[in-house]
Amino acid sequence: MEAKAIARYVRISPRKVRLVVDLIRGKSLEEARNILRYTNKRGAYFVAKVLESAAANAVNNHDMLEDRLYVKAAYVDEGPALKRVLPRARGRADIIKKRTSHITVILGEKHGK
């Protein structure tokens, strides 16, 4: 059995969030929480919210035990980019892409200790 949570259209670059997600993949729920709590990256806040949502889904919807949960899979997909114009010299303009992310965390339950 597995529980899943997704945060879509999060306004942070996928490249930056992947650095954080790579830290928790395969870890136990408690260890992942501790890692995210002390990770000094903006993406850690968003990943922590998705992790807590997945944990709540596991306990409330799938009757899984919280102390047995681990991060089975965690990945970040790219969402649509917001295009913004940056005026430049001589009447030109550059396009700035404000990137968005879809953050997915899947928790599994370990059997036996």
UniProtKB/Swiss-Prot annotation:
Source domain of life: Bacteria
Entries under Pfam families matching the protein: Ribosomal_L22 (PF00237)
Coiled coil spans: none
GO biological process, one term: translation
GO cellular component, one term: cytosolic large ribosomal subunit
Alphabetically ordered keywords of this record: Ribonucleoprotein, Ribosomal protein, RNA-binding, rRNA-binding
GO MF annotations in UniProt: rRNA binding; structural constituent of ribosome
Matching InterPro entries: Ribosomal_uL22, Ribosomal_uL22_bac/chlpt-type, Ribosomal_uL22_bac/org-type, Ribosomal_uL22_CS, Ribosomal_uL22_sf
CDD domains, per database record: Ribosomal_L22
PROSITE patterns, per the entry: RIBOSOMAL_L22 (PS00464)
Subunit-structure text: Part of the 50S ribosomal subunit.
Family statement drawn from the similarity comment of this UniProt entry: Belongs to the universal ribosomal protein uL22 family.
HAMAP family per record: Ribosomal_uL22_B
Function statement: This protein binds specifically to 23S rRNA; its binding is stimulated by other ribosomal proteins, e.g. L4, L17, and L20. It is important during the early stages of 50S assembly. It makes multiple contacts with different domains of the 23S rRNA in the assembled 50S subunit and ribosome. The globular domain of the protein is located near the polypeptide exit tunnel on the outside of the subunit, while an extended beta-hairpin is found that lines the wall of the exit tunnel in the center of the 70S ribosome.
Name under which the protein is recorded: Large ribosomal subunit protein uL22
Protein species of origin: Thermus thermophilus (strain ATCC BAA-163 / DSM 7039 / HB27)
